[in-house]
Amino acid sequence: MTQPPDLRVVVGTLFDHHEELKRAVERYPVACRVDRAPPQDRLFRMMRASRAAIAHGGDTLYELACLGVPTAVVCPTVRQLRVADRFAGAAAVLNLGVHRTLTRSRFQRGIIRLLRDTRLRRCLRTAGPRLVDGRGAQRVARTLAELAAS
C-alpha cells in the first residue's frame, strides 16, 4: 500500500486567510500541516526536502527552481502568468495557469501528473537550476564594482 504524502502548506505573513485555511486542512482526509512564515533557514530545509511543490508564483518560484524542486505553478495574476510561461517554456515548472480560470479538474490532473510522472519531475529538477542558478546577486555586485572602478 502506498504511503500518503507528507503535505505541508506554507503561507507568508501577508496571507489573510490563515485560520480559514487551517480549518479547511483539518477537514482534509490526509494529514497536512500549515506553516505561517517559517524562518528562512527552516523554509529552505523544507523546500530542499520536498519531492514536489505547488507555488503561487513570485520569488518562491525562483527559489524552488534554483533548488531543483519540481513545481506546479498556480498564478494569482496575468503578470505572473507571463513569468510562469517563461519558466514552463524552459521546462522548469508545470504551469497550471491563472487561479481564477483554473478548474478543479485541471488542477487535480496537474498535481496528479506532477506526483506520479517521475520523468516530468526529473526534467523539472534539472531544468530549474539551469534557469535560476542563484548567483544573480553576485553578478550584480561584480558589475557594480566594475562600474565603480571605471
Regions found by a protein language model. Give the residues of each.
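Nucleotide-activated sugar donor-binding and catalytic core shared by glycosyltransferases
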Residues: M1-S150
